């Protein structure tokens, strides 16, 4: 249960009980009332701004109103004390019995604790990675892959019906260049000396194998075909090979998509999907024939100094109108974006999230304009931009050669440090802030390495369970037994740990609402820190050890507390896509 939602309801009922009314009549607007943890834990367990946001409406000084509300809240059987602070904040401290009851709820729910109905089954499409199928994924793709994947997992846990999607950019000019690059490698595999790879083609050695496979399958047949026919075959085989490589890289990172949507699908039957999308916009009055003034700076490839078919995107929030069709009748890349969005919307998605690299910042307004125009404002589209990842080794920047074809791949990083450190650390900064990734730091065993610190807490929980088996003979810990004596958990440090656990449902919902999966990584680190601190207290004070051989009931209660810590760590790490180890190796 979300205890903050619980007390939000209790506080609003209290406002009704004291018959609080607006001075001008009508009903009070309670929507701005906030109920959250105090910024300073010493101030209490629950804080609310109710008096401050309602004082003007009821015509009463905020502190006086706060005192009135506070007095009424003292009647709540779970409230130990109520204080008014600052300009009118109300801080509540709850009784230990309340936390003991809540801990029992957490224990009974297991790893489902924190799962929410917030999404109410609403369909959400999360598109992420969508790297061009022209080669292996580099480290720059890694952050978006993790952010998108964890956000999708988080939304599922919060009750949304989520589809993870990858858009395969397999219809652009870069694919033609890729096919010609592989054709060269094919000729090389047949024994021809190709010399240095010509400028403009893909030089990477990863294409050598594709050329060899084509040579093994076709022999010299492709050379005997008309060039267009041969290139079409090479293109299909190469896209399949590149996507197989990309899927393998993503699998190594524990990233899995539900849908792989081919851009070429939009161009089937003379680009029927694109034509239908443009016709739909035309019927709504969003399309016209016109000529755009030349933009400042470098000219985009879809600008022409002649009449084009244009989208009135400025009428729906964009900076400039956008070309949909060139003067020669061919469609712009942007027209494909329109058709792709319409396809999602037609499949019942009213909420779509695009996770893109920071270099796509210029696309945000045009994509939002498409969403408004296609859905008549009914669909919500959010674009999350992921800033760059800078690689370091022992604090020194990792130099990458600018020579063509040489870069650090996603697989290089995963193979060196492991999947879990990569996933966790890619979340340890908000997506729109640059991130430094140090190969040495993410593998060191210290508090300064967040993923180690969190996974070590999970392992320590299980070490407590093993100690219980050795010292108390409790091999199969029973949750009913562990939860039967929570009234024995009275030490302030134990109650503080329960408070931290109780924040989890609110954390899940707030991270889902704001689409900020990094909040989960931060919370898990804080929870791990609280648990390690409790462990250390037991090392310093025998009375606070998790296992008291001479007090089996207290031991069971503390084991129940450890079990809930383990459950929440497991739940959070599962959402992140990392393991919750039972021991460190």
UniProtKB/Swiss-Prot annotation:
Alphabetized Gene3D superfamilies for the sequence? Arginyl tRNA synthetase N-terminal domain, HUPs, Isoleucyl-tRNA Synthetase, Domain 1
Substrates-to-products reaction catalysed: tRNA(Arg) + L-arginine + ATP = L-arginyl-tRNA(Arg) + AMP + diphosphate
A Gene Ontology annotation in the biological process aspect, one of them, is: arginyl-tRNA aminoacylation
Under InterPro entries, the record lists: aa-tRNA-synth_I_CS, Arg-tRNA-ligase, Arg-tRNA-synth_N, Arg-tRNA-synth_N_sf, ArgRS_core, DALR_anticod-bd, Rossmann-like_a/b/a_fold, tRNAsynth_Ia_anticodon-bd
Q: Which top class of enzyme applies to this chain? A: ligase
Record key words, sorted: Aminoacyl-tRNA synthetase, ATP-binding, Cytoplasm, Ligase, Nucleotide-binding, Protein biosynthesis
Under Enzyme Commission nomenclature, its number is 6.1.1.19
Q: Return the PROSITE patterns for the record.
A: AA_TRNA_LIGASE_I
Q: Where in the cell is it found?
A: Cytoplasm
Query: Superkingdom of this entry's organism?
Result: Bacteria
Q: Where is this motif: 'HIGH' region?
A: 131-141
Q: Which Pfam families match?
A: Arg_tRNA_synt_N, DALR_1, tRNA-synt_1d
UniProt xrefs under CDD domains:
ArgRS_core
Q: Name one GO cellular component term.
A: cytoplasm
Example GO molecular function: arginine-tRNA ligase activity
In the record, the note on similarity to other proteins reads: Belongs to the class-I aminoacyl-tRNA synthetase family.
Quaternary data: Monomer.
HAMAP family reported for this sequence: Arg_tRNA_synth
Q: Which PANTHER family does the record associate with it?
A: ARGININE--TRNA LIGASE, CYTOPLASMIC, ARGINYL-TRNA SYNTHETASE
Name of the protein described by the UniProt record: Arginine--tRNA ligase
| The species this protein was found in | Brucella melitensis biotype 1 (strain ATCC 23456 / CCUG 17765 / NCTC 10094 / 16M)
Q: Tell me the classification of the organism that encodes this protein.
A: Bacteria, Pseudomonadati, Pseudomonadota, Alphaproteobacteria, Hyphomicrobiales
Q: Which gene encodes it?
A: argS
């Amino acid at each position: 249960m979300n205890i903050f939602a619980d007390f939000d309801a209790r506080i609003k009922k209290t406002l009704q009980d004291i018959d609080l009314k607006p001075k001008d009549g009508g009903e009070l607007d309670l929507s701005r009332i906030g109920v959250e943890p105090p910024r300073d834990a010493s101030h209490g367990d629950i804080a609310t701004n109710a008096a401050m946001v309602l004082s003007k409406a009821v015509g009463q000084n905020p502190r006086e109103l706060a005192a009135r509300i506070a007095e009424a809240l003292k009647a709540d059987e779970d409230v130990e004390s109520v204080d008014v602070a600052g300009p009118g904040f109300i801080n509540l401290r709850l009784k230990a019995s309340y936390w003991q009851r809540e801990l029992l709820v957490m224990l009974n729910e297991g790893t489902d604790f924190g799962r929410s109905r917030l999404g109410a089954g609403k369909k959400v499409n999360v598109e992420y990675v969508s790297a061009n199928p022209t080669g292996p994924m580099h480290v720059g793709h890694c952050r978006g892959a993790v952010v998108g994947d964890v956000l999708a997992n988080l939304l599922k846990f919060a009750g949304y019906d989520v589809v993870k999607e990858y858009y395969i950019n397999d219809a652009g000019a870069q694919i033609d260049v890729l096919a010609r690059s592989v054709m060269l490698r094919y000729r090389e595999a047949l024994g021809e000396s190709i010399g240095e790879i010509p400028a403009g083609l893909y030089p990477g050695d990863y294409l050598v194998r594709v050329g060899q496979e084509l040579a093994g399958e076709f022999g010299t047949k492709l050379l005997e075909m008309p060039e267009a026919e041969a290139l079409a075959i090479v293109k299909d085989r190469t896209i399949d090979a590149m996507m197989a490589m990309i899927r393998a890289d993503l699998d190594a990172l524990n990233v899995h998509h539900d849908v792989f949507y081919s851009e070429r699908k939009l161009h089937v039957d003379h680009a029927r999907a694109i034509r239908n999308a443009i016709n739909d916009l035309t019927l709504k009055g969003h399309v016209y024939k016109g000529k755009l003034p030349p933009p400042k700076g470098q000219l985009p490839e879809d600008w022409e100094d002649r009449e084009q078919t244009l989208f009135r995107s400025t009428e729906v929030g964009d900076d400039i109108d956008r070309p949909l069709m060139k003067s020669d009748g061919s469609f712009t890349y942007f027209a494909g974006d329109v058709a792709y969005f319409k396809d999602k919307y037609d499949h019942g998605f009213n909420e779509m999230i695009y996770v893109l690299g920071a270099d796509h910042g210029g696309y945000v307004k045009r994509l939002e304009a498409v969403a408004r125009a296609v859905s008549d404002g009914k669909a919500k589209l959010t674009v999350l931009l992921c800033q760059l990842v800078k690689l370091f080794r022992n604090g020194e920047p990792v130099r990458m050669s600018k020579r063509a074809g040489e870069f650090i791949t996603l697989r290089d990083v995963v193979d060196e440090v492991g999947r879990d450190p990569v996933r966790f650390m890619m979340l340890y900064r908000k997506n729109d802030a640059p991130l430094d990734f140090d190969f040495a730091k993410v593998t060191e065993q210290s508090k300064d390495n967040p993923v180690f610190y969190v996974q070590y807490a999970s392992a320590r929980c299980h070490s407590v369970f093993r100690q219980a088996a050795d010292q108390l003979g409790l091999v199969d810990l029973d949750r009913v037994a562990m939860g039967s004596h929570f009234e024995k958990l009275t030490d302030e440090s134990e109650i503080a740990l329960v408070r931290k656990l109780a924040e989890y449902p609110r954390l899940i919902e707030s991270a889902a609402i704001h689409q900020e999966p990094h909040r989960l990584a931060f919370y898990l680190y804080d929870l791990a820190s609280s648990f390690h601190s409790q462990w250390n207290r037991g090392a310093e004070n025998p009375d606070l050890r998790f296992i008291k051989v001479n007090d089996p009931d207290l031991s069971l209660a503390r084991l129940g507390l450890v079990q809930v810590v383990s459950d929440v760590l497991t739940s959070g790490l599962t959402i992140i896509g990392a393991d919750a180890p039972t021991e460190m190796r």
